[in-house]
């Protein structure tokens, strides 16, 4: 019999409570989630529902109260972290480093020689449209450019799993749309597994093949995304597609139902 492929991420009936006291409810309760290798998954939900906590658990930065978490079959937190490139909220660039040296940080942390790391960082910045800013400080870049540099750093780490926490959350609508298109193009050829947290339903649908809704510490919804169905179509055309609008409406209706249920 052929072997069952090992998923990139497996979250098996996981609970997380910061305290056993009954007045402190669990952050996550019986969360079960499997992400096949190469899939792009978006996790949406209201503030405080446990989205970022779930990412930290997957990446080995937190330990669950109960349940099992594996990344590429490994349960040990250090091994899980070794498979993941983490992109926290905000650009998190080091202000005293050049943009190029910021992007090279993951390579330098893994012992890659400085000259080689800088060369690879420069090539990635060229792909990202930031080649002219390689020797600049982060303070000289716009918010969108800093976010693009942070994404470039995460992608240059060349890890099989990318964990992104609100990667475009602090950007204006126009810049967000531009970077969504750019990121979709990069992800299409990367082969990486993406687990992304976002509060933006359009962003979730555009950048993922699957969208799950987290509410009150539980997974309460699961829908197909539109990443594969975009097929190189411009973002504006996809947003105007009646099928996309129907997907958005269904998810927003579920979000609204969650809001009414917890009100």
PLM regions with names:
Residues 44-46:
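The feature captures the beta-strand-to-loop junction immediately N-terminal to the Walker
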Residues 59:
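Helix-to-loop junction immediately C-terminal to a conserved catalytic motif
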Residues 97-104:
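Short coil-to-helix segment of the ABC ATPase nucleotide-binding domain corresponding to the Q-loop/switch region
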Residues 137-141, 145:
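Conserved ABC ATPase signature
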Residues 162-165:
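Catalytic Walker B motif of ABC-type/P-loop ATPase nucleotide-binding domains
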């Amino acid at each position: 019999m052929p072997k069952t492929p090992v998923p990139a991420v497996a979250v098996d009936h996981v609970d997380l409570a910061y305290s056993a006291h009954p007045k402190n409810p669990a952050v996550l309760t019986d969360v079960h989630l499997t992400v096949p290798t190469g899939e792009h998954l978006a996790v949406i939900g209201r503030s405080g529902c446990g989205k970022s906590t779930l990412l930290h658990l997957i990446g080995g930065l937190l330990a669950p109260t109960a349940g099992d978490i594996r990344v590429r079959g490994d349960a040990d937190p250090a091994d899980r972290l070794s498979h993941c490139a983490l992109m926290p909220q905000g650009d998190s660039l080091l202000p005293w480093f050049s943009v190029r040296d910021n992007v090279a940080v993951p390579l330098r942390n893994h012992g890659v020689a400085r000259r080689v790391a800088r060369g690879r960082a420069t090539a990635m910045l060229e792909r990202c449209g930031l080649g002219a800013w390689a020797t600049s400080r982060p303070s000289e870049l716009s918010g969108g450019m800093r976010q693009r540099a942070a994404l470039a750093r995460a992608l240059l780490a060349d890890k099989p799993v990318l964990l992104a926490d609100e990667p475009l959350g602090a950007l204006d609508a126009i810049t967000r749309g531009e970077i969504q298109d750019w990121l979709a193009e990069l992800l299409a050829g990367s082969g990486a597994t993406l687990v992304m947290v976002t509060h933006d339903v359009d962003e979730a649908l555009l950048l993922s093949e699957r969208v799950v809704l987290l509410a009150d510490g539980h997974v309460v919804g699961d829908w197909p995304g539109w990443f594969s169905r975009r097929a190189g179509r411009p973002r504006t055309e996809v947003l105007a597609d009646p099928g996309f609008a129907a997907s958005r409406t269904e998810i927003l209706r579920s979000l609204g139902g969650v809001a009414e249920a917890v009100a």
